[in-house]
Amino acid sequence: MISNAAISKVLRQIAYLIELEETKDNHEDNKNKVNTVFKIRAYRRTADVIENLSSNVEKIYNKWKLKGLTEIPSVGKAIALKIEEYITTGNIEYFGELKKRTPINVEEFYHLEGIGIGPRSVKALHDRLRIKNLAELEKAAAEGKIHSVPGFSYKKEESILRKIQSLKKDRGRYLLGDIYPLVKQIEVCLSNIKDVKKAIAVGSFRRMKETVGDIDYLVLSDAPEIVMDYFASMPEVDEVIGKGPSKTFVKLNNGMDADLLVVPKESFGSALQYFTGSKEHGVALRKIAISKGLHLNEWGIYDSNNNKMVAGSKEEDVYNILGLEWIPPEMRENNGEIELAKKERTGDGNKLKLPDLIDYNSLKGDLQVHSNDTDGMLSIQDIASAAKEKFELEYIAITDHTKSLALAHGLDEGRLLDQVNKISELNDILKNHFKYNNNNNKNKKDSSSSNSFRILSGAEVNILKDGSLDISNNVLDKLDVVGAAIHSNFSQPVEVQTNRLIKAAQNPNVDIIFHPTGRIINKREGYPVNIEKLINDAKDTGTVLEVDAHYNRLDLKDEYIRMAVQNGVKLVIDSDAHHSMHFAFLVFGIGQARRGWAKQSNILNTFSVEKMLNSLK
């Protein structure tokens, strides 16, 4: 079965190739240029939608054919036909024709867009230096040839080298959000086998790392042969690499390697700990075991004197016999969690404690949501309805982009105030709707304020080059929630960039700094920021820092979250939703917050709407 990520990737490459061709044809008339721009946007928008779609596109096609594809948001008939062709044949003729017309390896180059190397830049490099692939680009950059091309600087040359090294390092690793639905789907299918008692995806996936190399499934069953046969024949499996009595290796349809191991009941807990990792965490546990006269491996904990198993069936028992509290998987990186988990008291008589991490079901609201007033895909009413009905949130803030972000059709002061009035009217409609429902609810005990829902007015205000904002303070003062973010001038020095953020944070109307470092995982490193200085200023000014839960951002990084928590800086976890399906990304933000040791009390949008608003500046 073809993954959504594979379809999205092809559509992005088609858009890239169209733009590459457009840069060659300087004689194209204005009408055709406009059509080409819209065509490029259509392919990219469709790629975004499909990449974030919770349902598998091939399954939609198998059930509803072309009609099902055209009912996916933003998918027009022309692109739907291309998707149909890809699903049914594995190829797109138009894509092949585009590739034949250029010597440039688009599959390699389109990863560089995050550092500002788009089709126009790639064409310039090819025209001047005949560069056709990443290997040739790396060689030219290492030899100092890139900065000789008009439009390229020494700084850009260095940036290219860093990006290529990063791509090499991350080669074969997948974004957590790209593979999460597939991994969970397989996990559920395995769990539903009659002879399976437990099935868990372990490794870095269980630890909610932002990228994952491969997938390991651990299964508790007394019928390993049945499990092996089932796993090897799943439609999600592309190729069986190896199959034994209790372990099978496969390649999934998305190109990812996956292993499945069946273990007996007496060893399941020990295997769960061992294969969850991290490697460093496991090494530290084995050292503790040795110090206690024990031997720890994936099959259990044994007394070193007589080799008798003393624990292994439950993961909690493995930790307990080592004198430790059970440690949440997200914390298992050997960064101090083991010291906190020790049951004995410290020298001063105090007992260190593991933090009570934020729960995966604890978010009550989402404070970065976009509507089709700018670059979102749904109306305010539609995305609010989905937030309540499908994701059971109690409030959202509509934080559309503002005027200096022309690409997103950002709001000026007038349109922003119009939106505030629209939100007020929608809240009145919602209030009457819930009042009516409560009056008609036979079970009065269930007709509490939990049925209410509130839309907050807000904005994602653009931080300009000098740190000022692109919306006046007298308008910002009328909003419920103000987030500020950098969307341009990424290459300024670290001192300038940090001061830019700090100046925005010091504005009394700015409640939250959105995606504080601006990174796009595997695409853009983000702008340089003195994060320690920003965190200290956030503490002094009472400014909240955001954990952007979109899986290609996860900004803040986990180590920065931990730093913020240690300094008493409040955080929010937001989906950065541009469509209702994006609320599903909140799970990745929570996972990231847990990796940063955040408690529920550290995250403001675990609070009720009134308590959250009162906790802002």
Segments (PLM) and residue ranges:
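Accessory alpha-helical DNA-binding modules that contact the DNA backbone or grooves
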Residues: 5-8, 15, 23, 37-247, ...
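Charged, low-complexity interaction regions
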Residues: 22-32
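Extended, compositionally biased low-complexity polar/Lys-Gly-rich tracts
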Residues: 33-50, 118, 446-472, 479-483
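Short acidic-aromatic active-site loops that bind/stabilize oxyanions
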Residues: 176, 372-373
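Two-metal-ion RNase H-like nuclease active-site motif
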Residues: 199-201, 365-369, 460
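Charged catalytic cores and adjacent phosphate/nucleic-acid-binding surfaces used
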Residues: 208-292, 298-371, 380-394, 403, ...
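Positively charged, glycine-rich low-complexity segments
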Residues: 377
